């Protein structure tokens, strides 16, 4: 593991995150209270327009969060023991995001993260995340979420060519601490990874 690679990937991811398209920069921000923002009904416009609006509102939100990758688990039913032994399952790295909760308490975020992949190479990722949140009635401070991320990543073995990566998301939150995870599907000895981080 080369610390210079991690630092460079973090800087590169941060630069990508800080350069938003002009369409996002021109969107006025809305009233904010404790991570929640009121907005016009989400049913306005087509799917693409709603996505752009949600990305814009998350981008303009004053709320920030830190992402800390904690585990990369390779599905033992889909890998040879030899492959498992050769893989890194501690994805050292860091990430940064801007987030908001909408009027239905659903989570929206734009983020960038860089971490050490299964081969101990730096992997940057940036994207938009959405989760429909469920708040149990009697459990103050708890939230459970399920949703998706529409992201772009780049990997060493593909010469860091940007690759689209839509993935599912689930999380368990208590107050502002969240354990969030995704599953990367794949074939035998490839993919099938449960990636988990704290935010």
UniProtKB/Swiss-Prot annotation:
<keyword id="KW-0472">Membrane</keyword>
<feature type="active site">
    <location>
        <position position="118"/>
    </location>
</feature>
<keyword id="KW-0998">Cell outer membrane</keyword>
<protein>
    <recommendedName>
        <fullName>Lipid A acyltransferase PagP</fullName>
        <ecNumber>2.3.1.251</ecNumber>
    </recommendedName>
</protein>
<keyword id="KW-0808">Transferase</keyword>
<keyword id="KW-0012">Acyltransferase</keyword>
<feature type="active site">
    <location>
        <position position="117"/>
    </location>
</feature>
<feature type="active site">
    <location>
        <position position="74"/>
    </location>
</feature>
<dbReference type="InterPro" id="IPR011250">
    <property type="entry name" value="OMP/PagP_b-brl"/>
</dbReference>
<dbReference type="InterPro" id="IPR009746">
    <property type="entry name" value="LipidA_acyl_PagP"/>
</dbReference>
<dbReference type="Pfam" id="PF07017">
    <property type="entry name" value="PagP"/>
</dbReference>
<keyword id="KW-0732">Signal</keyword>
<dbReference type="GO" id="GO:0009245">
    <property type="term" value="P:lipid A biosynthetic process"/>
</dbReference>
<feature type="site" description="Role in lipopolysaccharide recognition">
    <location>
        <position position="83"/>
    </location>
</feature>
<comment type="function">
    <text>Transfers a fatty acid residue from the sn-1 position of a phospholipid to the N-linked hydroxyfatty acid chain on the proximal unit of lipid A or its precursors.</text>
</comment>
<comment type="similarity">
    <text>Belongs to the lipid A palmitoyltransferase family.</text>
</comment>
<dbReference type="GO" id="GO:0009279">
    <property type="term" value="C:cell outer membrane"/>
</dbReference>
<feature type="site" description="Role in the phospholipid gating">
    <location>
        <position position="188"/>
    </location>
</feature>
<dbReference type="GO" id="GO:0016416">
    <property type="term" value="F:O-palmitoyltransferase activity"/>
</dbReference>
<comment type="subunit">
    <text>Homodimer.</text>
</comment>
<feature type="signal peptide">
    <location>
        <begin position="1"/>
        <end position="25"/>
    </location>
</feature>
């Amino acid at each position: 593991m080369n610390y210079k690679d991690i630092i460079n990937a973090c800087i590169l991811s941060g630069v990508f995150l800080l350069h938003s398209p002009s369409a996002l920069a021109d969107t006025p921000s809305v009233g904010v209270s404790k991570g929640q923002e009121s907005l016009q009904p989400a049913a306005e416009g087509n799917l693409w327009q709603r996505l752009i609006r949600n990305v814009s509102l998350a981008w303009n939100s004053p709320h920030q969060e830190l992402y800390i990758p904690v585990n990369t688990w390779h599905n033992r039913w889909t890998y040879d023991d030899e492959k498992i032994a050769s893989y890194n399952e501690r994805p050292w790295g860091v990430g940064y995001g801007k987030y908001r909760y909408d009027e239905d308490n659903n989570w929206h975020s734009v983020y960038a993260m860089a971490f050490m992949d299964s081969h101990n190479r730096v992997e940057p990722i940036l994207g938009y995340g959405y989760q429909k949140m469920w708040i149990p009635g009697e459990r103050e401070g708890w939230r459970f979420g399920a949703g998706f991320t529409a992201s772009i990543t780049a990997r060493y073995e593909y010469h860091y060519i940007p690759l689209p990566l839509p993935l599912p998301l689930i999380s368990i939150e208590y107050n502002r601490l969240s354990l969030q995870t995704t599953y990367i599907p794949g074939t035998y000895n490839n993919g099938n990874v449960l990636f988990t981080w704290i935010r």
